[in-house]
Amino acid sequence: MLLAIEQGNTNTMFAIHDGNEWIAQWRAATESTRTADEYVVWLSQLLSMQGLGFRAIDACIISSVVPQSIFNLRNLSRRYFNVEPLVIGENAKLGVDVRIDKPSEAGADRLVNAVGAHMVYPGPLIVIDSGTATTFDIVAADGAFEGGIIAPGINLSMQALHEAAAKLPRIAIQRPANGRIVGTDTVSAMQSGVFWGYIALIEGLVARIKAERAQPMTVVATGGVASLFEGATDSIDHFDSDLTIRGLLEIHRRNTHLETQ
């Protein structure tokens, strides 16, 4: 079975694929100092709940945007599963043509998303990933990664609003309950500013990208808060929560195929 680890700045996802389907997915808060021993204490309990032991894992792939965590995740795979992991950006061959000025700067998560999106949707594509940062990435019709846009994430914006303005409370991010744009109290005004502000960001950047490239493009959204925008904009064609793990599975398949040639 394959253990796929996808680590963002906020959360780390662990997923198990049995060769046919994903049978388990778990999330933990990303902590860059968490050791392999700490990971395995947590993970062993979850594996046990699925009726699985360490020996069931015979492959591992890691994608992380937190460089200081990769050492411990690699040790987790080596020490406890006796598996040399594929690591995006190190020893994993992605099969993606990276057409940007500095290919080494392309984030692992963005390249994995490009692979996952190209497998399912007709290109060219705009892939929006709503996480700690909100990224808009361009995937050509042939699957190449052609750059994109990086903006602050919605949670980061809300946090900055609270921390920088003494009288503004910390609130949950949600669509304003009354459905209106203009808030009538502080909380609804903040919710409207962040929620509809991000809708405007999405709609504006998607329109500008399409105009600059002068071609029809399919827009796919993924990430932790992407579902929040469902039904609020016509600029997104597909919401796909499995985009990243689909990309990881395909990259693992490509590398396994290369090893057997």
Swiss-Prot record:
Keyword DNA damage included in the entry's annotation: no
Residues holding K(+): D129
Record keyword Metal-binding present: yes
One GO term of the biological process aspect: coenzyme A biosynthetic process
Active site residues according to the UniProt entry: D109
Binding site for substrate: G107, A108, D109, R110, T186
Necessary cofactors: NH4(+); K(+)
EC number: 2.7.1.33
EC class: transferase
Reaction(s) catalysed by this chain's protein: (R)-pantothenate + ATP = (R)-4'-phosphopantothenate + ADP + H(+)
Subcellular location(s) per record: Cytoplasm
InterPro entries: ATPase_NBD, Type_III_PanK
Main location: cytoplasm
Annotated ATP binding sites: E6, Q7, G8, N9, T10, N11, T12, M13, T132
Pathway membership: Cofactor biosynthesis; coenzyme A biosynthesis; CoA from (R)-pantothenate: step 1/5
GO cellular component annotations of the record: cytoplasm
Pfam families, per database record: Pan_kinase
Family: Belongs to the type III pantothenate kinase family.
Function: Catalyzes the phosphorylation of pantothenate (Pan), the first step in CoA biosynthesis.
PANTHER family linked to this entry: TYPE III PANTOTHENATE KINASE
HAMAP family per record: Pantothen_kinase_3 (MF_01274)
Complexes and interactors: Homodimer.
Full protein name: Type III pantothenate kinase
Naturally occurring in which organism (per UniProt): Caulobacter sp. (strain K31)
Gene it is expressed from: coaX
